[in-house]
């Protein structure tokens, strides 16, 4: 069994991306219950969670919310690949407690990857 639930993360140099977020990003505070990304909008940031926790929520056709993922301090948060390709998110990412997140514009990250 992989060491991470999302096994792709084992193939990414997370130290590099953490350093990018901390050196290039803006530290933003989000109160509990605030959206990092709202379903139906394009995610503006890729973030490194300095403190706090967030949940990924998708909605069924009747509007019922379903938690499909979680992020905690020391992890990354974004709608991948939607944020990089400027596509509308199918889910919301919502803080479950107050959070401090280093936010890097997803447009800048996409430019650096080309």
What are these regions (language model features)?
Residues 29, 47-48, 94:
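Well-ordered beta-strand positions
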Residues 33, 44-57, 73-74:
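Glycine- and acidic-residue-biased ligand/ion/polar-headgroup-sensing regions
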Residues 57-63:
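Cytochrome P450 core scaffold surrounding the K-helix E-X-X-R motif
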Residues 1-31, 81-82:
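Cyclic nucleotide-binding regulatory module and flanking cytosolic helices
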């Amino acid at each position: 069994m992989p060491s991470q639930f999302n096994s792709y993360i084992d193939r990414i140099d997370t130290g590099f991306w953490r350093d990018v977020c901390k050196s290039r990003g803006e530290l933003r505070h989000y109160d509990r219950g605030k959206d990092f990304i709202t379903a139906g909008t394009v995610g503006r940031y890729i973030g490194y969670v300095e403190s706090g926790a967030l949940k990924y929520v998708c909605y069924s056709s009747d509007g019922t919310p379903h938690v499909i993922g979680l992020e905690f301090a020391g992890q990354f948060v974004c709608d991948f690949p939607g944020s990089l390709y400027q596509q509308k998110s199918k889910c919301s990412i919502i803080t479950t407690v107050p959070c401090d997140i280093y936010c890097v514009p997803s447009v800048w990250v996409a430019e650096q990857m080309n």
